[in-house]
Amino acid sequence: MTNIRKTHPLLKIINSSFVDLPAPSSLSSWWNFGSLLGVCLGVQILTGLFLAMHYTSDTATAFNSVTHICRDVNYGWLLRYLHANGASMFFICLYLHVGRGLYYGSYTYSETWNIGILLLFAVMATAFMGYVLPWGQMSFWGATVITNLLSAIPYIGTELVQWIWGGFSVDKATLTRFFAFHFLLPFIVAALVMVHLLFLHETGSNNPTGIPSDSDMIPFHPYYTIKDILGFLIMLTALSMLVLFSPDLLGDPDNYIPANPLNTPPHIKPEWYFLFAYAILRSIPNKLGGVLALVMSILILAIVPILHVSKQRSMMFRPLSQCLFWLLVAVLFTLTWIGGQPVEHPYIIIGQTASVLYFLIILIFMPTTSLMENYLLKW
C-alpha cells in the first residue's frame, strides 16, 4: 500500500516540500536561515496574537496597556520581550539570509529573489509600525520623522502624509491604523513566504559551489530536518538568553517615557536594524535625495542579478570578490554605528563616506572585479 503522505491531496504537497524534496548534499549552515526565519515568523505571530488580546490602540491608554501587559498579565512580560527581541532575531536572520544569497549567487533565481525583496520590504514595514504601538517617546517621534519623509514627494507629498496620519499630526487615528496594519501584514508576509517557497521549489536549491547539483541530491528528511532542528535550538536558546537576561539591551530607554508631542528627544533614531538605512538617509543634505537613497539602499538588491557578470555563480572560488563582499559587510556595520550617533563632526563625514562606498561596491566595484576575475581565469 502506498504511503498516505504520497497520496493524500494536502499531505503530498507537504511531502514534496519538506520530506521527499531532493536537496543538494553540500548545503552548509548558511542554508539554515530560511527555516529559522519561518520559526521567527511563527513566534512573532503567536506572541503578537496574545499581546493584541490585551493591547488597546488608543493614545490615552496604549502606553498603560503595555505596562499592564508587563505587570498584570500572566507571563505578559515574557510575551512582550519575546515579541520585541524576536523582531531583532528576525532581522539578524533576514540580513544573514540575504548576505548568503549575495555571497553564493542565489540571486540568479530571479523570481525567488524578487519575492524575497518584497518580503524584506513587508517585514520592514511591519516592524516600523510595531515600534509605534507602545506609544513611548521614540515611538511617537520615530513615527513622526519617518512618515514625514513622504512629504518630500513632489506635488502630493504633504497631502499624502496627512492622509497617512489621518489628521495634521501623528495622533489617535495614526495609532489605530498602524495597529490594524501591524496585525494584518504578518499574514500577508506568511502568504508571500509560500510564494517564495513555490518559486524556490521550481528551480531547486542553490549550493555553496554554485555548480548544478542534479547528480548528487539527498532527501530533505531526515538529513536537513535534523540540521534545521539544531538551528532552531541554537536560535531559540540565544533568543531566550536575550529575553531573560537583558531584555532591554536592544531597545531605547526613551521608549519608557510616554509619548509627548511637546518634548522632542535629543536623538531620534529607529530600532538598530534600520540604522544602516537611516544613516544613508541622513548622509544626504537634500530631503528628497535622502529619501531616494533610503529606498535605493534596499531596492538596489533588485538589480544585483543584472550586475552579475562573473562566469562563476558563487564567490566560493573568487577571492577578490570575497574581499569586496566582506568590505561591504564592514561598511554596513559602520553605517549601523553611525545611524545611532548624533549628527555632528566626525560622524557626518564617516556616514557620507560609508554611504558612497556602499553604493560604489555594489554598482561598480563588484561587477568590475568579476570581469577582472573572468580575464585572469581566461574565461
UniProtKB/Swiss-Prot annotation:
One of its GO terms (molecular function) is ubiquinol-cytochrome-c reductase activity. Pfam families: Cytochrom_B_C, Cytochrome_B. It is found in: Mitochondrion inner membrane. Keywords: Electron transport, Heme, Iron, Membrane, Metal-binding, Mitochondrion, Mitochondrion inner membrane, Respiratory chain, Transmembrane, Transmembrane helix, Transport, Ubiquinone. Binds 2 heme b groups non-covalently. Its cofactor is heme b. InterPro entries: Cyt_b/b6_C (IPR005798), Cyt_b/b6_C_sf (IPR036150), Cyt_b/b6_N (IPR005797), Cytb/b6-like_sf (IPR027387), Cytochrome_b (IPR030689), Cytochrome_b_C_euk/bac (IPR048260), Cytochrome_b_N_euk/bac (IPR048259), Di-haem_cyt_TM (IPR016174). CDD domains: cytochrome_b_C, Cytochrome_b_N. A ubiquinone binds at H201. Its main location: mitochondrion. Heme b b566 binds at H97, H196. Heme b b562 binds at H83, H182. One of its GO terms (biological process) is mitochondrial electron transport, ubiquinol to cytochrome c. Component of the ubiquinol-cytochrome c reductase complex (complex III or cytochrome b-c1 complex) that is part of the mitochondrial respiratory chain. The b-c1 complex mediates electron transfer from ubiquinol to cytochrome c. Contributes to the generation of a proton gradient across the mitochondrial membrane that is then used for ATP synthesis. PANTHER family: CYTOCHROME B. Heme 1 (or BL or b562) is low-potential and absorbs at about 562 nm, and heme 2 (or BH or b566) is high-potential and absorbs at about 566 nm. Belongs to the cytochrome b family. This is Cytochrome b. It comes from Pygoderma bilabiatum (Ipanema broad-nosed bat). The lineage of its organism: Eukaryota, Metazoa, Chordata, Craniata, Vertebrata. The gene is MT-CYB.
